[in-house]
Structure formats: structure tokens, C-alpha cells
Amino acid sequence: MLGLIKKKANTLLGIDISSTSVKLLELSRSGGRYKVEAYAVEPLPPNAVVEKNIVELEGVGQALSRVLVKAKTNLKSAVVAVAGSAVITKTIEMEAGLSEDELENQLKIEADQYIPYPLEEVAIDFEVQGLSARNPERVDVLLAACRKENVEVREAALALAGLTAKVVDVEAYALERSYALLSSQLGADTDQLTVAVVDIGATMTTLSVLHNGRTIYTREQLFGGRQLTEEIQRRYGLSVEEAGLAKKQGGLPDDYDSEVLRPFKDAVVQQVSRSLQFFFAAGQFNDVDYIVLAGGTASIQDLDRLIQQKIGTPTLVANPFADMALNGKVNAGALASDAPALMIACGLALRSFD
């Protein structure tokens, strides 16, 4: 599978650096069944990461050090991801039968016609997808390119915590990997469905439509759980930390549900509906089989039910760990609550088994 940097390693920590937290996941596999060995989530300082870009390297490095302690893991090799919006991908046809080295050399010659940056500033990777449908003597090759600074800043943040980035992946591919674990939730093989995965983070909502297990459409929108946190702060005079805790643990005044939470849920429904309309307008589909909610905001009580009721499409909250065993040190309740926010970390941790 595609990764902008690959170095051979055994078990790898999946580390997702989002705008508000770092999430760590360690998986093992025995007899075809996965097991969660360790996981932890650690908040980031405000504005340490802005719109998927690491701004405060030191702050992110310190959060990574804390998340390692919290997870009680001894592993030092990790997989991180760059955002899909930072990556240029292009499927190109190439001669069949070339070795990996020959493909790589050929791509270096041809890459500048596909990439709008000087090649010395770019990390490039590729994956052979299979024989071309148009010409059986050629193969389809997926080319991925990303500015080196996006890769290097993630490597540097990990290094501050004593970690080595063995693979730098792409968030969209990590999502595809963890999505494949949702078959039992969806009641069907994920390869047979068209599913809208809506990842509602703190500041960004990403719609990824997967058809037969592959991402066919992505759209990012500036909208997320931070809007709810800010409204709690404003209305009840709380700090960011207090508002974030109250949002998760409750204890807010009686009017919270009707005056704050319900309008926010309605706004989420509107965002999901609008994103789907953009997807349908783009062409070949006018329906999806399921809506799957991911990200920290997905676990708001009954949000899935409200979306299903308003949009009319079966909706569920992602839990990639539903069929996994758990190490005794892993808190099952906390993991279930955090599961929808761990889709990318899970997809990254699965790189251990490539």
C-alpha cells in the first residue's frame, strides 16, 4: 500500500496528529484476529496544529511524549499521515513488466509534468494498481506526491518524542484500511457498497465516499465540534478546557439540550446533507447505501439517529474495534467512546501487517 516513505519494520504505532489532539494506537494480530494492545489520546495546545499543518513543533512533540506514557507502550516505530489535501495523486499508464526500480526511474523522468512543484521539494511514491482496462500491455500506476516539508515536520515532531516515522501515509488511504473493518457493522462486505464516511473533527468535516472499498470522492469543509465547544463557553462562561469536559461528561444547565446541543446537531445534519448534494451533483451517483459517522463529534448521543431520520439513509457510528480482542490494560468503555475518532489511527496501525 502507498506510503510516501517506507522502511521495513515490525509492529508500528499508528499516530494521528489532528488539530486538537494526538491519538496513538498499537495493534497485534493472532490467527487472523486483531487485538488492541494499547491506545491513548492526548490534547494538543491551542493552535499547535492549524488546518492539518503543524505550527508549534515543540508543543506537538511534548504531546507525543505524554501520549506514549499514557499508552504504556515501549514501541518506538510509528506511522503518521499527511492530509489528503496536501497530496497530489494521479493515475498514469505505464509499460507492463517493469521492475519496481525501472518504474521508479521512469516516474522520476515523467513526474514533473504531473506535479506543480520543483521535484527536489517533493516526496514521491507510487503503487501499481493492476493491468490497464484500456490496454492489457500497460499497467495503471497510482502516483502520489507531497511537499517534503509536510513529511519532514511530522518526522521532526515524532523525533522529539524519541519516535521514528517508518511510514508516512495519506489520511484517505488510512481511512480505507479501517473502513474495511466495518463489514460486521454494515452487515455486508464493504467491497460491495457505496458508503459516505463523514469525519467530523474539531474544525474540519471531511466527506469521503467509498465505492467498492476505494475512495471516489472527498470534500473538506470548515465545520466541526469546536463550534459546539465555543457556544458552551459563550453561553455558560466556561474556559475552553471546562467546556470541552462538560461537552463529554455532562453537568451543564437544563437548557443545554434545547438551546445549544439541538441547534448544533441540526447544523451537523445540514452539513452532511449539503456535502452529499455536492457529491450527487458531481455525477454518477444519486444515493449511498450508508452514512458512517467518524471523528470526535460522531459520538454525540443520537446524532446518527437524527441524520438517518432527516436524510433517510441508514446511518451508524464507526467502530473499527467491534470484532477485536483487547489487552487487559485497555479501558473498553473509553475505547468504545473514542472509537469513531480513531479511524485514521487504526488505519495507520494496520500498516504493521502489510
From Swiss-Prot:
Phenotypic consequence of gene deletion: Deletion mutants lack surface pili.
Residues annotated to bind Mg(2+): D112, I115
One Gene Ontology biological process: type IV pilus assembly
Subcellular localization: Cytoplasm
One GO term describing the cellular component: type IV pilus
Keyword tags: ATP-binding, Cytoplasm, Magnesium, Metal-binding, Nucleotide-binding
Main location group: cytoplasm
Pfam family, one: PilM_2
SMART domains per UniProt: FtsA
InterPro entries per record: ATPase_NBD, FtsA/MreB, PilM, SHS2_FtsA
Binding positions for ATP per the UniProt entry: S18, S19, T20, S21, V22, K23, A202, T203, K247, G296
GO terms of molecular function: ATP binding; metal ion binding
Subunit description: Interacts with PilN; this interaction modulates PilM ATP binding site. Interacts with PilP. Interacts with PilO. Interacts with PilB, PilC and PilT.
Biological function: Inner membrane component of the type IV (T4S) secretion system that plays a role in surface and host cell adhesion, colonization, biofilm maturation, virulence, and twitching, a form of surface-associated motility. PilN/PilO heterodimers form the foundation of the inner-membrane PilM/PilN/PilO/PilP complex which plays an essential role in the assembly of a functional T4 pilus. In turn, associates with PilN and facilitates PilM functionally relevant structural changes that differentially impacts PilM binding to PilB, PilT, and PilC.
Protein name: Type IV pilus inner membrane component PilM
Species, as recorded: Pseudomonas aeruginosa (strain ATCC 15692 / DSM 22644 / CIP 104116 / JCM 14847 / LMG 12228 / 1C / PRS 101 / PAO1)
Taxonomic path: Bacteria, Pseudomonadati, Pseudomonadota, Gammaproteobacteria, Pseudomonadales
